[in-house]
Amino acid sequence: MQKRVKVKPNSKQQKIAEQDDGSLTVHLKSPPVDGKANEELIKLLAEKFDVPKSHITIKSGLSSKQKLIEIETDI
């Protein structure tokens, strides 16, 4: 499953909001430095979709706020 994700780093609280078009807006506490925001994003998405962190891959947008995420599900 692929999801478009808009990341908002340096937020006061962690939050995942699903948009009408099926994309996600994810608020992260971590700054976008040394991959910390990406690590936090993967951890949050793994918890939301109940999959191991190793099943989540950032396909594009590694250094961008707009990302394409691949989530491997066991379905």
UniProtKB/Swiss-Prot annotation:
Region (Disordered): 1-32
Gene3D superfamilies per UniProt: YggU-like
InterPro entries in alphabetical order: DUF167 (IPR003746), YggU-like_sf (IPR036591)
One Gene Ontology cellular component: cytoplasm
Domain of life: Bacteria
Disulphide-bonded residues: none
Similarity-based family: Belongs to the UPF0235 family.
HAMAP family recorded: UPF0235
Name the record gives this protein: UPF0235 protein asl3196
Lineage: Bacteria, Bacillati, Cyanobacteriota, Cyanophyceae, Nostocales
